[in-house]
Every structure is written in structure tokens, then in C-alpha cells.
């Protein structure tokens, strides 16, 4: 696991009794080194309109300038970079209504890994087509994200794919 550190070993328990991993500055530095040269360097931009509306100095970070149009490429790319050769060889599966789907598809293509993305049937066509253009096998299923996520989990179990959770993963979050 390249750049992984001990992120899965440092865990705490939240109010619901669920375990979650604490991320450290070293984890973020490891992710940054993997992502260097992959993602666009997006600088903060002062927003006059939002500053006026809130009475504060507001700055925005234009992550829409990333190759996939969203910050989700950061987490997906970093997560896939930490997978073992065996996990990559099994192929990937995820569920998403758009931005995570494109991030996984792009990162998988860059790593030479096959990816299947399950998307709700209500996903905007531009996101479906972009995900396909990045090389993923897209399956449209269900009207809402939960339907797509259920099928993706079933495919991971039945086909042995490595499941890339769209948000509940400390490695993915470290990259984002």
C-alpha cells in the first residue's frame, strides 16, 4: 500500500459507536505527493459577490478546473493508487451519480484497471457519457443512489470486484 501510512490503525469511536480513522498531516502529505502532477493546482479566488452577501471575505477554490470537473478525482485517484496489485487485478466497482464516477473511471484508466460504475437511471447524460469516455463500464440501475449502491455492493460480492466506496473511506477522504 503506497502512501497509506497507518491510517486504518489509528481509529476512534464516534457517538454512534462506529469506528472511524483519524487522518494525520503525514497522511495528507503522502496523498499530495501521489496527486502531484495529476490534479490541477487550483488557487483560491476572492468572490466579491459572496463577500458582499455575507459581509465577510469569501474565497472560493475552483475545483471545476480539475480534469473531471470536480474535486472527486483527488480521492478516487489516491484510493486507487493505494490498492494492491491483487485488488486492482480483480477490477473495481463503485456507485455514483456523477463526480465520483468520473473520478474512479479516470483514475482506473490511468492505472490500467478495469472499472464498473453503477449509476442511477436519473443521472445526467453528460456524467454518464463522461464516465464511459474515461473507460468505465457503466450500468444504469435504479432511480436513486441507494439502488445503484446496492447493486454495486452485490457485484463486488458476486464478481469479486474491489469496491470503491464513494465517500465512507478514510483513504479516499485523505486524498480529497
PLM features: what roles do these ranges have?
Residues 9-10, 153:
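Alpha-helical interaction segments
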Residues 12-18:
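Acidic, Ala/Val/Gly-enriched low-complexity intrinsically disordered segments
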Residues 1-8:
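Short, small-residue-biased leader/transition segments that mark boundaries at the very start
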Residues 5, 13, 75-77:
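Sequence-pattern detector for short linear motifs
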Residues 8-9, 27:
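Generic signature of intrinsically disordered, low-complexity, basic-rich segments
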Residues 19-176:
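PLP-dependent amino-acid enzyme catalytic core
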Amino acid at each position: 500500500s503506497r502512501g497509506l501510512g497507518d491510517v486504518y490503525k489509528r481509529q476512534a469511536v464516534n457517538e454512534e459507536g462506529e469506528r472511524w480513522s483519524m487522518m494525520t498531516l503525514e497522511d495528507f502529505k503522502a496523498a499530495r505527493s501521489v496527486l502531484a502532477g495529476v490534479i490541477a493546482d487550483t488557487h483560491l479566488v476572492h468572490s466579491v459577490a459572496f463577500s458582499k452577501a455575507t459581509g465577510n471575505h469569501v474565497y472560493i477554490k475552483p475545483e471545476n478546473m480539475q480534469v473531471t470537473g470536480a474535486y472527486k478525482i483527488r480521492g478516487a485517484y489516491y484510493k486507487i493508487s493505494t490498492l494492491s496489485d491483487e485488488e486492482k487485478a480483480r477490477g473495481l466497482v463503485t456507485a455514483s451519480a456523477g463526480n465520483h464516477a468520473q473520478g474512479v473511471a479516470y483514475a482506473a484508466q490511468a492505472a490500467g484497471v478495469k472499472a464498473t460504475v453503477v449509476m442511477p437511471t436519473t443521472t445526467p447524460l453528460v456524467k454518464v457519457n463522461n464516465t464511459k469516455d474515461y473507460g468505465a463500464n457503466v450500468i444504469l440501475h435504479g432511480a436513486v443512489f441507494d439502488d445503484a449502491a446496492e447493486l454495486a455492493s452485490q457485484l463486488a460480492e458476486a464478481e469479486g470486484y474491489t469496491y470503491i466506496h464513494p465517500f465512507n473511506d478514510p483513504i479516499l477522504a485523505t486524498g480529497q
